[in-house]
């Protein structure tokens, strides 16, 4: 860069610093390279598919899928994992359908969980905005976008046409929220439902509610589906679930994870550790018997999983080995490097 352009840049940077404060503009290379903080989803396979070990703090996430596919269960597992990290969590229940007994079974500390059941979409998003701006809440769930009914629609009569009201509401709210979420390092998860587009000849007719704004503002989008049933004899005891990472701004996208959600228990984590352990060679399988480091841990997956539940230190050991093998190496956090503003020369 020649001297005249360098002087012009220096003058501009000095003016920006005076007007907007120190650190308003920085050279990217002078910032410390930090590992993106994340919270586990409760599923080992999904944590690996997401690339950073879970859902990222300081970002907006969308989880969508058909009815009874496990959307709320997955978010409650995220809350349980975040609470184990000592985080504060809030649940904005626009559907008025949160079951505290089920949440407690999944490991959620309901005494520490903040819950709101707002009357209108505007109220729900305003409450979420105030919680984010407080800087004291780490995880906020909004269940669901489809239930964020605009005030005009609630006060109107049945059958009244309110074209695009919800989409405009979401677009305006996300413009306000996205910066606050980053500054507060808060994870905001929107649960969404699926609708069908009429007259689609080619491609998928499915779309999500609330317009296109959330598709753009979300750093991670997860498509969750029930692909089968888990049976014990003739009794159905859970769902076979598949989650596709359809958008990911923090790691390579388009990966998927398969796991089981057991009724009344949530994600079948030990079963997942057994399956991935066998696949990656950490757990040996001979016929129906499973063994780890030469010691038999059980006959059949159910007995082996029960053994891991009774010996959590072995489950943690296998899980750590799987994560170290499958998770990409992340850059080491440079603690000494300060966030330096561009200085005038």
UniProtKB/Swiss-Prot annotation:
One of its GO terms (biological process) is DNA repair. It is found in: Cytoplasm. One of its GO terms (cellular component) is cytosol. PROSITE patterns: RECA_1 (PS00321), RECA_2 (PS50162), RECA_3 (PS50163). This is Protein RecA. GO terms for molecular function: ATP binding; ATP hydrolysis activity; ATP-dependent DNA damage sensor activity; damaged DNA binding; single-stranded DNA binding. Belongs to the RecA family. Keywords: ATP-binding, Cytoplasm, DNA damage, DNA recombination, DNA repair, DNA-binding, Nucleotide-binding, SOS response. ATP binds at residues 65-72. NCBIfam families: tigrfam_recA. Can catalyze the hydrolysis of ATP in the presence of single-stranded DNA, the ATP-dependent uptake of single-stranded DNA by duplex DNA, and the ATP-dependent hybridization of homologous single-stranded DNAs. It interacts with LexA causing its activation and leading to its autocatalytic cleavage. It holds the Pfam family RecA. It comes from Hahella chejuensis (strain KCTC 2396).
